[in-house]
Amino acid sequence: MTRSEFLKPLIGEPWAWQSRNCWDFACHVERELFGRELPRVAVPAELSKRWVLEAIDRHPERAAWRQVADGPGGLVTADDGALVLMAHLRFPAHIGVWLRSEARVIHCSEQHGVCCESVLALRQSGWKRLTFYDPL
């Protein structure tokens, strides 16, 4: 299966807190496209923004990834398959996967389900702070 054949049917899949949240989706993409197994995260029964913020901030998996500095003019220099933490203001509350050849971030949001967006589109939709992480 080609990369395009894998990605195309995912677009538009719905978000689901217990089974298809942003982390579960990032794990799926990392496993299928990049052969990386990321740990599963047990989520509480009820959606809690506070829980999301704390889980992203404190999860030990973050130690296995290196933050990538922005290139000149804010260009993305991260490797293909980098994790992308997204924040509206200061604290990350969402995660996606950088697809370098497509110059897009694929992610699964509560509002839109699975979508593949440019950095500019993400910033225009309110994700003002994007931080890229390459695996160690």
Model-based region annotation:
Residues T2-R3:
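Short, charged, amphipathic alpha-helices and their helix-cap/turn boundaries
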Residues F6-E13, G35:
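A glycine-biased structural micro-motif
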Residues P14, S19, A42, P60, ...:
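Solvent-exposed, flexible loop/coil residues
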Residues P14-F34:
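Active-site nucleophilic cysteine motif
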Residues C22, C27, C108, C115-C116:
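Generic recognition of cysteine residues
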Residues R36-E46:
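Short acidic alpha-helical/loop segments enriched in Asp/Glu that coordinate divalent cations
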Residues P44-G113, L136:
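...with weaker cross-activation on analogous glycine-rich loops/strands in unrelated enzymes
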Residues C115-L136:
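Glycine-rich, aromatic-bearing surface loops/beta-hairpins
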